[in-house]
Curated annotation (Swiss-Prot):
<dbReference type="GO" id="GO:0046902">
    <property type="term" value="P:regulation of mitochondrial membrane permeability"/>
</dbReference>
<dbReference type="GO" id="GO:0097190">
    <property type="term" value="P:apoptotic signaling pathway"/>
</dbReference>
<dbReference type="GO" id="GO:0019901">
    <property type="term" value="F:protein kinase binding"/>
</dbReference>
<keyword id="KW-0053">Apoptosis</keyword>
<feature type="modified residue" description="Phosphoserine; by PKA, PKB, PAK1, RPS6KA1, RPS6KB1 and PKC/PRKCQ">
    <location>
        <position position="136"/>
    </location>
</feature>
<dbReference type="GO" id="GO:0005741">
    <property type="term" value="C:mitochondrial outer membrane"/>
</dbReference>
<dbReference type="GO" id="GO:0001836">
    <property type="term" value="P:release of cytochrome c from mitochondria"/>
</dbReference>
<feature type="region of interest" description="Disordered">
    <location>
        <begin position="160"/>
        <end position="179"/>
    </location>
</feature>
<dbReference type="GO" id="GO:0008625">
    <property type="term" value="P:extrinsic apoptotic signaling pathway via death domain receptors"/>
</dbReference>
<dbReference type="GO" id="GO:0043066">
    <property type="term" value="P:negative regulation of apoptotic process"/>
</dbReference>
<dbReference type="GO" id="GO:0097192">
    <property type="term" value="P:extrinsic apoptotic signaling pathway in absence of ligand"/>
</dbReference>
<dbReference type="GO" id="GO:0006007">
    <property type="term" value="P:glucose catabolic process"/>
</dbReference>
<dbReference type="GO" id="GO:0140608">
    <property type="term" value="F:cysteine-type endopeptidase activator activity"/>
</dbReference>
<comment type="subunit">
    <text>Forms heterodimers with the anti-apoptotic proteins, Bcl-X(L), Bcl-2 and Bcl-W. Also binds protein S100A10. The Ser-112/Ser-136 phosphorylated form binds 14-3-3 proteins. Interacts with AKT1 and PIM3. Interacts (via BH3 domain) with NOL3 (via CARD domain); preventing the association of BAD with BCL2. Interacts with HIF3A isoform 2 (via C-terminus domain); the interaction reduces the binding between BAD and BAX. Interacts with GIMAP3/IAN4 and GIMAP5/IAN5.</text>
</comment>
<feature type="modified residue" description="Phosphoserine">
    <location>
        <position position="134"/>
    </location>
</feature>
<dbReference type="GO" id="GO:0042593">
    <property type="term" value="P:glucose homeostasis"/>
</dbReference>
<keyword id="KW-0963">Cytoplasm</keyword>
Length: 204
């Protein structure tokens, strides 16, 4: 009479686990280690659920974890799997928070240096402090030197073109305007010059 009572205890205990733990609802009534294999399969299917269901399952696993691990060896898989689920949820949260490639583009637009080049520049500065800057400097420097030479050549040609030409008559008045202290002297000098050019022989 003692032998038929023992098999009835294991299914009752398994039924109690099925009612309490939602993650172990798919447990079979096989004896030995077979009844924990479906539990592992159901645990690997947890990431397919929605985040709200994962949070509920994780809360129940946290509440029932210590009591189950003390009695039976099967639920030892729950803490590690729980950590992996939390890690996956963290990844999903970071991806949704940053917004994928668009957030990377906005960050590279607003920030002066991308995240990867800062580390590379730090390594280059440790090896040789001026190498990272001198790589990009010479092309700009050469272009600036070429541009300066062209400007000097054009300005020299522009100034040389006026050397053979006669000086304009208004150049004297321009110098007098700079040196004179008032408009009266400018008007008098201009009036005297015009009278002299008019052919007044007594003045000459």
């Amino acid at each position: 009479m003692g032998t038929p009572k023992q098999p009835s205890l294991a299914p009752a205990h398994a039924l109690g686990l099925r009612k309490s733990d939602p993650g172990i609802r798919s447990l079979g009534s096989d004896a030995g280690g077979r009844r924990w294999r479906p539990a592992a399969q159901s645990m690997f299917q947890i990431p397919e659920f929605e985040p709200s269901e994962q949070e509920d399952a994780s809360a129940t696993d946290r509440g029932l974890g210590p009591s189950l691990t003390e009695d039976q060896p099967g639920p030892y898989l729950a803490p590690g799997l729980l950590g992996s689920n939390i890690h996956q949820q963290g990844r999903a949260a970071t991806n949704s928070h940053h917004g994928g490639a668009g957030a990377m583009e906005t960050r590279s637009r607003h920030s002066s240096y991308p995240a990867g080049t800062e580390e590379d520049e730090g390594m280059e500065e440790e090896l040789s402090p001026f190498r990272g800057r001198s790589r990009s400097a010479p092309p700009n420097l050469w272009a600036a030197q070429r541009y300066g030479r062209e400007l000097r050549r054009m300005s020299d040609e522009f100034e040389g073109s006026f050397k053979g030409l006669p000086r304009p008559k208004s150049a004297g008045t321009a110098t007098q305007m700079r040196q004179s202290a008032g408009w009266t002297r400018i008007i008098q000098s201009w009036w005297d010059r015009n009278l002299g050019k008019g052919g007044s022989t007594p003045s000459q």
